[in-house]
């Protein structure tokens, strides 16, 4: 069967979850985009996404990408396509148009040009003129303009897939069904249900969370009750294939109700929304399985037949439903007290647009996810309901932890204002680019010589080593102030903030453990999952400044043989593998980082037979004649500035040794290949002899994203090719 490219849209902040879900349907990630993902697979997988995706809004089958730097160019690209393959003879269609550029600033104008192109294309082929139907068309054509390119596709879903068909009435503050599903996945509900856990929502409203929890646990397709999809009159539709998928969904829905069924309960103090929830449950076919009661939190008690483990997930009112902040704080306090009394051993998830009230729950959050409820920023706070996780009014600092304290309020206000400003600029840029790990602050103010990095809701603070001329007591004072201000502005729990002193790394220091917590967690970068550890080493496992270099590698790796020297945790190799590299070899002398790199590749389902990681001294490997016959199309070399590790055959000085290293790499580079050479030695000067031997181009400026442009010397980077290649 032929492969297709699909663009699948979703709520903002759900992209990585969606990519994982679509992979289960046989759709492989091509690239991430804001509020959606590009994937590749067979039509059957696209049908599965329409029927089974709990997270998607729309599934769009890509027809073509055309140039659209002007209205005429857009029209020419559209009219040149074979639209008879996508719009039935004499049928109807409509166009949805998103985006703008300098030439096309109005979406209605853009949509009209696309309509004109489609109609003229079909008429020019001698076929009957199709009609334009704003409502209930046979086919919906999706047009998405991004700068000078227009992506055209067929909307297979036909409607937003968040509409499952069971919710026609709404509570006061409805939560969209696919966002509810995302919250359940982030909270770990599938694993909890599989292990015998139950589900409760203490402020259930119209019942969206509890219904979605039941559909998920019982393996019921979210699109099962939909009567019509956007592909049913599309000429490329395969009715027999679709029928078989519908029959499979019915079989799985029946089988899902066999055996043990978790308990599903929803409570709300408002009897009117409980009545709405009961109707939604009936329409979803979950009567007798999902139960709801009109009961305020203060009167909640655990049922005798509930499991010892489970998930209580709720979306407390905020903003519109309760205007008084004191009342809201009291509500959160009551929620925390009730859960701690009645549901020990359970997990609590609170989805809120007012995360500052999370502290009122009286529990320590172990994870926070930043999401959006419509256009409103919100957070999902997760808690393990255990006595040891209770937050006391004055928790003592752990050994070595900096106790927050403000000695100079005026100075602290300056830092507070700078962080807020950076959140509006760099933070907003990162959100638009769908970047979850970035540098927010880099010694912007001389009083606070810190680097502050965000790792998807956690904060990594590195204090630059102060010169001897700086008073040690004053430096400690300023650091304590920063530790007070940072969690306040960034709205993170103290346990999600890590502070280290950053020093020049010599010899084996970067490989030495600073702690032994073993607290690894996964972050995401341009479609890649990567393991990081904020506490145990001087570095975290991910050099954020090299993000554009890694993404460039991903975009240019398809079909290439990739070599990663001094590979660290293999993040660049992961990008190469995700980008379609035919094979790769990654070398590092650290056993720790070799294992870490292997874990990263496994996280992304890379074939270990094709993507090999070896513990090796890169200097010795490059000098070894036995490896000289290995050829690569793309090589990435990012060596340390200096290393005298006992495991190395010699001492590495990058300024002294780089020319030989480059020549040895070029000896292993295919005739039309590329070496990416990078280092972070601030005083580095490239050997001029290399420019006469090879085609050398410095690309440093293009390898710095917005969050590192304040520090242009953080690394330098060159593209090196064979001459006349």
UniProtKB/Swiss-Prot annotation:
Entries under CDD domains matching the protein: AdoMet_MTases, THUMP_AdoMetMT
Places the protein is found: Cytoplasm
Keywords, in A-Z order: Cytoplasm, Methyltransferase, RNA-binding, rRNA processing, S-adenosyl-L-methionine, Transferase
Coiled-coil ranges per UniProt: none
Signal peptide: none
Keyword check for Mitochondrion: no
GO molecular function: 23S rRNA (guanine(2445)-N(2))-methyltransferase activity; RNA binding; rRNA (guanine-N7-)-methyltransferase activity
Segments forming domain THUMP: 45-156
Function of the molecule: Specifically methylates the guanine in position 2445 (m2G2445) and the guanine in position 2069 (m7G2069) of 23S rRNA.
Descriptive protein name: Ribosomal RNA large subunit methyltransferase K/L
């Amino acid at each position: 069967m032929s492969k297709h490219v699909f663009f699948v849209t979703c709520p903002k902040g759900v992209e990585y979850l969606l990519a994982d879900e679509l992979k289960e349907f046989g759709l492989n990630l091509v690239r991430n985009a804001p509020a959606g993902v590009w994937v590749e697979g067979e039509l059957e997988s696209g049908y599965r996404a329409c029927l089974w995706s709990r997270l998607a809004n729309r599934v769009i089958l890509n027809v073509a990408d055309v140039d659209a730097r002007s209205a005429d160019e857009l029209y020419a690209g559209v009219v040149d396509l074979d639209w008879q393959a996508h719009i039935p003879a004499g049928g109807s269609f409509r166009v949805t148009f998103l985006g703008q550029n300098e030439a096309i600033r109005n979406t209605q104008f853009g949509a009209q040009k696309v309509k004109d192109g489609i109609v003229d294309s079909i008429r020019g082929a001698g076929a009957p003129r199709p009609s334009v139907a704003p409502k209930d068309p046979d086919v919906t054509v999706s047009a998405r303009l991004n700068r000078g390119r227009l992506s055209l596709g067929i909307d297979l879903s036909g409607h937003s897939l968040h509409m499952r068909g069971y919710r026609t009435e709404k509570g006061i503050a409805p939560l969209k069904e696919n966002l509810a599903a995302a919250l359940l996945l982030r909270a770990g509900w599938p694993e909890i249900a599989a292990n015998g856990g139950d589900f409760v929502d203490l402020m259930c409203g119209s019942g969206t969370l509890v219904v979605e929890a039941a559909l998920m646990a019982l393996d019921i397709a979210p699109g099962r009750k939909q009567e019509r999809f956007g592909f049913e009159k599309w000429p490329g539709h395969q009715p027999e294939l679709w029928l078989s998928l519908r029959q499979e969904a019915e079989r799985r829905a029946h089988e899902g109700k066999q055996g043990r069924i978790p308990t599903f309960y929803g409570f709300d103090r408002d009897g009117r929304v409980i009545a709405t929830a009961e109707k939604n449950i009936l329409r979803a076919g979950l009567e007798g399985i999902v139960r709801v009661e009109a009961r305020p939190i203060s009167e909640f008690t655990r049922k005798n037949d509930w499991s010892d483990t489970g998930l209580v997930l709720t979306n407390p009112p905020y903003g519109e439903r309760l205007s008084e902040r004191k009342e809201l704080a009291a509500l959160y306090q009551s929620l925390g007290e009730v859960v701690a009394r009645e549901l020990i051993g359970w997990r609590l998830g609170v989805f809120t647009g007012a995360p500052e009230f999370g502290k009122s729950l009286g529990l320590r959050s172990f994870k926070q996810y930043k999401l959006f409820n419509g256009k409103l920023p919100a957070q999902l706070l997760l808690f393990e309901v255990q006595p040891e996780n209770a937050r006391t009014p004055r928790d003592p600092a752990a050994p070595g932890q900096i106790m927050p304290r403000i000695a100079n309020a005026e100075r602290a206000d300056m830092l507070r204002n700078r962080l807020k400003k950076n959140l509006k600029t760099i933070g907003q840029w990162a959100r638009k680019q769908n970047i979850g790990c970035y540098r927010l602050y880099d010694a912007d103010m001389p009083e606070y010589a810190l680097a502050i990095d965000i790792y998807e809701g956690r904060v990594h603070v590195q204090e630059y080593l102060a010169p001897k001329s700086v008073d040690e007591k004053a430096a400690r004072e300023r650091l304590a102030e920063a530790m007070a201000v940072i969690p306040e502005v960034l709205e993170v729990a103290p346990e999600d903030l890590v502070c280290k002193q950053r020093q020049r790394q010599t010899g084996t220091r970067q490989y030495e453990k600073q702690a032994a917590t073993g607290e690894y967690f996964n972050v995401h970068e341009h479609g890649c999952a990567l393991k990081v550890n904020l506490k145990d080493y001087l570095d975290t496992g991910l050099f954020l400044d090299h993000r554009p270099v890694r993404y460039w590698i991903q975009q240019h790796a398809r079909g290439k043989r990739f070599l990663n020297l001094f590979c660290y945790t293999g993040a660049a190799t992961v990008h190469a593998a995700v980008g379609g590299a035919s094979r790769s070899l990654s070398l590092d002398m650290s056993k720790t980082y070799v294992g870490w790199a292997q874990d990263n590749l496994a996280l992304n389902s890379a074939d270990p037979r094709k993507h090999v990681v070896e513990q090796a001294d890169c200097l010795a490997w490059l000098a070894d004649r036995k490896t000289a016959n290995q050829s690569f199309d793309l090589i990435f070399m990012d060596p340390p500035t200096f290393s005298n590790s006992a495991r190395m055959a010699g001492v590495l000085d990058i300024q002294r040794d780089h020319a030989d290293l480059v020549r040895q790499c070029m000896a292993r580079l295919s005739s039309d290949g590329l070496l990416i050479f990078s280092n972070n030695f601030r005083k580095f000067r490239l050997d001029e002899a290399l420019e006469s031997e090879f085609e050398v181009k410095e690309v440093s400026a293009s390898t710095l994203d917005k969050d590192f442009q304040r520090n242009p010397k953080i690394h330098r980077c060159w593209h090196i090719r064979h001459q006349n290649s």
